[in-house]
Amino acid sequence: MFFEIIGMIIIAYLLGSIPTGLWIGKYIYHKDIRKLGSGNIGTTNTFRTLGFKAGVVVLFIDILKGTLAASQPYFLGISGTVNPLLIGLFASLGHTVSIFDNFHGGKAVATSAGILLAYNPLLFVVACLIFIFVLCLTSMVSAASMVGISAIFIIALFIHAWILAIVAGILTGVVFYRHRSNIHRILSGKESMVSFGLGYYLREKKQNK
């Protein structure tokens, strides 16, 4: 069992470490995404700098990384002994501190969502709905991401799912830390917005006065 756990942790970290946006940008679009837009290698910056198709692919793969990592205990039939969330946590670690990107990485949002998908698909749907609602309200991917992960942490506390609460709490801290520059921009009214939603409408209306 010990070696199985170590093996799952290593695989989870390596899966999470795959810098999807960086590699797609470099090998398909011949662009270094780290030098474009926000410089982040995650989904949002991929959408903004490489386009819709690339963004969708990166989103799918980054979610899949978390799902596959957290599904390992199910594959091995030991999910009753080894909690999938604890294994999946190492995928988010890999995503933010990637061995393939000089220990830099993304903001862990999509990969964390993938972990939740493997563990509890219903909560994954809830998180997605919250994300979409906040995105339509604020027009800010960063705000939607932080609210979405925070909501899962609060829900886990409410339903007494303690391991989920611990993992979601850790990931909430990671997501907020990785979004610290976004938080400063939100507070100063300078955060980037998607071109739809109430926040975008109000900003455009204000600027066009």
Swiss-Prot record:
Catalytic reaction(s) noted: an acyl phosphate + sn-glycerol 3-phosphate = a 1-acyl-sn-glycero-3-phosphate + phosphate
Family per record: Belongs to the PlsY family.
Matches recorded under InterPro entries: G3P_acylTferase_PlsY (IPR003811)
Originating organism: Limosilactobacillus reuteri (strain DSM 20016) (Lactobacillus reuteri)
Broadest EC class assigned to this enzyme: transferase
GO BP of this protein: phospholipid biosynthetic process
Descriptive protein name: Glycerol-3-phosphate acyltransferase
SMART domains: G3P_acyltransf
Keywords: Cell membrane, Lipid biosynthesis, Lipid metabolism, Membrane, Phospholipid biosynthesis, Phospholipid metabolism, Transferase, Transmembrane, Transmembrane helix
Membrane topology listed for this record: Multi-pass membrane protein
GO molecular function, one term: acyl-phosphate glycerol-3-phosphate acyltransferase activity
Transmembrane segments: 5-25, 50-70, 74-94, 115-135, 151-171
Keyword field contains Transmembrane helix: yes
Cellular component terms (Gene Ontology): plasma membrane
Pathway named in the protein's UniProt entry: Lipid metabolism; phospholipid metabolism
Subunit: Probably interacts with PlsX.
Lineage of the species this protein comes from: Bacteria, Bacillati, Bacillota, Bacilli, Lactobacillales
The keyword Kinase is assigned to this record: no
Subcellular compartments: Cell membrane
GN (gene name): plsY
E.C. number(s) listed in UniProt: 2.3.1.275
Function: Catalyzes the transfer of an acyl group from acyl-phosphate (acyl-PO(4)) to glycerol-3-phosphate (G3P) to form lysophosphatidic acid (LPA). This enzyme utilizes acyl-phosphate as fatty acyl donor, but not acyl-CoA or acyl-ACP.
